[in-house]
């Protein structure tokens, strides 16, 4: 079944989903092939290491994060990006409160 968001997403019309542990998520635009998600982290919050079958590209909109992917760890800041291959262990720790913009291919049905 085809899934698709509205054409426009406005900050004041989107709800934050509380994921616990100082992490919140907003679902942005999506269809069956792609999804964009905004994730807000408080300082010290952790995106626990995990694996999924999706390609993922993350843009650091604000803050500072320690990211681990495919066995490598780097500090990333606003303006930086991270690519996570499918089926690769990855996770992050928020060093300074911030927002990540995650893009997935295909759509993360488990987020809807």
Mark where each language-model region is.
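Conserved short histidine dyad/triad with adjacent acidic residue
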Residues: 20, 35-51
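Short, conserved beta-strand element in jelly-roll/cupin
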Residues: 40-41, 51-67
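Histidine-centered metal-chelating micro-motifs
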Residues: 46-47, 66, 82, 86-91
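Structural motif
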Residues: 57, 64-66, 73, 89, ...
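A cytosolic small-molecule/anion-sensing beta-strand core signal
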Residues: 61-62, 77-78, 96
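Short acidic-glycine-tyrosine-enriched beta hairpin
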Residues: 71-86
